């Protein structure tokens, strides 16, 4: 039906006959001549229809925005003075010989060039219209280029693209599972996979050596800006590898991806231990573009007559940290109060601060309600953080976890608000993670997942599991975790030991993970891998604000699809066939 896409037209095609298909982006009538901007996925071309072609003119005259047209005509240069250098096809136009209306269109709920004035709910309800916007087409085209580049790289490295099951069994992997009732096994349920983790390990036991998959994953969890109930991973696993093998391979893959798709050469990927990342940045995924760091001042604060600081400084699980912001003394009290409210979100009880107006005057040159408690240590404090005139110092004092979360988040917010970024891209590897983290009740939970290998011997692990480090590694870019991986446990005894620490007894382990434990008895090779969040990767590379912008048909924050009204009710007959009976829905906010 067509010879070219609209965006392919240029001056080299002048005087050629072309056939175009697309949507009316805009229609204008100037002095009896009709101008149509015809749009397809590649761009927009200007079409001129004059009365000398009566049938074409009549069809163009009745065309409205979003009508679907087929145009045949000749390419010519635009008259001087009407050329548009800001438009890829702005030097030429198509003089139409034939205009065929392939389909009409109702008035859309919003105009494509006015989407910014329309709420996201309306756009998601009519996603098929929203996806016509060039910005959305560009993002999904970029997503396609990314997956193509990744596949080409991994295939070139000897990886096999192998699909793993979508219907599997529920296993405790951290989040809630999406459950699927079985009709043929009454009262029993499949679970949708939170990741292909166990299956890819079994593929290594099977001897496939190198596996990858662009995999759909499902997690029934509370949603945030960077989460969806169904999401996509670039998943890979390899046998007979150590951490350095996987890290080197995936770093090279990401470097080539950025070069191929964005023409960007990423800087070096430094390695940073987890403990250092938490101490210096308050986060295990620090944004190294922001030149702000947390500084420990516990030792200085232990003797001050200010219990808000001295208490946490003396506590085993406490921390007092300072965050110096160069030039931050210009912040108003209103702005500081707003930052105080911000850290409250992360559990901080307040946000102490000191403005350094004129350091040479000693304590008289400082502005703060707390300096009166620090006369004996103030010079040491200012030296410790490297304070100069015009700086502000923020403080966090509480349990170390709260201080890290609050000041870590404040650091990122200050970087955004004050535009402190020093470079466009800042990648790194975070390594040497703890195997476990303790919850509020002191129970241990796997920091990554229970199949991650510890970096110590089985004897050392059993002697002190709480302090064991793991063979895990996370790739971080601009404060976003791009991917996480580890060397896996390939020994059944060690796997049972990890389950035991997590409170998973032998009977429960056999019930839920018996297939994995059995497989580990039959010559499992050392293996490891990594999974990238494709949605996050595309979001970063495209500059999108949320991953909803880089998924064709995303869910809302409440895990619903506004376009299809999913999830929806099913008939009583369907439920009966599945041997399911629903409890009565809550009415008037009452209890179920």
UniProtKB/Swiss-Prot annotation:
It catalyses: tRNA(Asx) + L-aspartate + ATP = L-aspartyl-tRNA(Asx) + AMP + diphosphate. It comes from the Bacteria. L-aspartate binds at residues 173, 219, 448, 488. Keywords: Aminoacyl-tRNA synthetase, ATP-binding, Cytoplasm, Ligase, Nucleotide-binding, Protein biosynthesis. Residues 197-200 are annotated as: Aspartate. It holds the Pfam family GAD. GO terms for cellular component: cytoplasm. It is an enzyme of class 6 (ligase). ATP binds at residues 219-221, 228, 481, 533-536. One of its GO terms (biological process) is aspartyl-tRNA aminoacylation. Homodimer. This is Aspartate--tRNA(Asp/Asn) ligase. It comes from Chromohalobacter salexigens (strain ATCC BAA-138 / DSM 3043 / CIP 106854 / NCIMB 13768 / 1H11). The gene is aspS.
């Amino acid at each position: 039906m067509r010879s070219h896409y609209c965006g392919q037209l240029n001056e080299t095609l002048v005087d050629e006959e072309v056939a175009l298909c697309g949507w009316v982006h805009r229609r204008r009538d100037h002095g009896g001549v009709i101008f149509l901007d015809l749009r397809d996925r590649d761009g927009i071309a200007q079409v001129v229809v004059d009365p000398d072609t009566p049938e074409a003119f009549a069809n163009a005259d009745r065309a409205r925005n979003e009508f679907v047209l087929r145009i045949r005509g000749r390419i010519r240069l635009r008259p001087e003075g009407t050329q548009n250098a800001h438009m890829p096809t702005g030097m030429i136009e198509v003089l139409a010989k034939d205009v065929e209306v392939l389909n009409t269109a109702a008035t859309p709920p919003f105009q494509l060039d006015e989407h910014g004035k329309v709420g996201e709910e309306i756009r998601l309800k009519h996603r098929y219209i929203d996806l016509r916007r060039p910005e959305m087409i560009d993002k999904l085209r970029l997503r396609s280029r990314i997956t193509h580049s990744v596949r080409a790289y991994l295939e070139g490295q000897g990886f096999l693209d192998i699909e793993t099951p979508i219907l599997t069994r529920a296993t405790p992997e951290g989040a809630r599972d999406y459950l699927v009732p079985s009709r043929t096994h009454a009262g029993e349920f499949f679970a949708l996979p939170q990741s292909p983790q166990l299956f890819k390990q079994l593929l290594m036991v099977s001897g496939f050596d190198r596996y990858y998959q662009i995999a759909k994953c499902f997690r029934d969890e509370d949603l945030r800006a960077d989460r969806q109930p169904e999401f996509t991973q670039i998943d890979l696993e390899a046998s007979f590898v150590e951490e350095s093998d996987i890290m080197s391979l995936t770093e090279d893959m990401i470097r080539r991806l950025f070069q191929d798709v964005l023409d960007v050469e990423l800087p070096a990927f430094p390695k940073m231990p987890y403990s250092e990342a938490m101490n210096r940045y308050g986060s295990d995924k620090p944004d190294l573009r922001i030149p702000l760091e947390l500084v420990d001042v516990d030792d200085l604060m232990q003797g001050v007559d200010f219990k808000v600081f001295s208490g946490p400084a003396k506590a085993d699980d406490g921390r007092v940290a300072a965050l110096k912001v160069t030039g931050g003394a210009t912040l108003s009290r209103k702005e500081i109060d707003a930052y105080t409210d911000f850290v409250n979100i992360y559990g901080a009880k307040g946000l102490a601060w000191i403005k350094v107006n004129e350091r040479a005057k000693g304590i008289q040159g400082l502005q703060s309600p707390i300096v009166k408690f620090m006369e004996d240590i103030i010079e040491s404090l200012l030296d410790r953080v490297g304070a100069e005139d015009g700086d502000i110092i923020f403080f966090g004092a509480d349990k170390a976890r709260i201080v890290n979360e609050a000041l870590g988040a404040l650091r990122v917010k200050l970087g955004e608000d004050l535009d402190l970024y020093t470079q466009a891209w800042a990648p790194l590897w975070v390594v040497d993670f703890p195997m476990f983290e303790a919850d509020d009740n002191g129970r241990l939970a796997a920091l990554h997942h229970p199949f991650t290998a510890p970096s110590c011997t089985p004897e050392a692990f059993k002697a002190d599991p709480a302090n064991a480090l793991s063979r895990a590694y996370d790739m971080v870019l601009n404060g976003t975790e791009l991917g996480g991986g580890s060397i896996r446990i390939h020994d059944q005894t060690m796997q049972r030991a990890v389950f035991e620490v997590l409170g998973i007894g032998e009977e429960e382990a056999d019930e839920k993970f018996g297939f994995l434990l059995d497989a580990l008895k039959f010559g499992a090779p050392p293996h490891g891998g990594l999974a990238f969040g494709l949605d996050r990767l595309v979001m970063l590379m495209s500059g999108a604000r949320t991953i909803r912008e880089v998924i064709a048909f995303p869910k809302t924050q409440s895990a619903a699809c506004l376009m299809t009204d999913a999830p929806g009710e099913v008939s009583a007959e369907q439920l009966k066939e599945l041997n399911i009976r629903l409890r009565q829905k809550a009415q008037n906010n009452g209890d179920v």
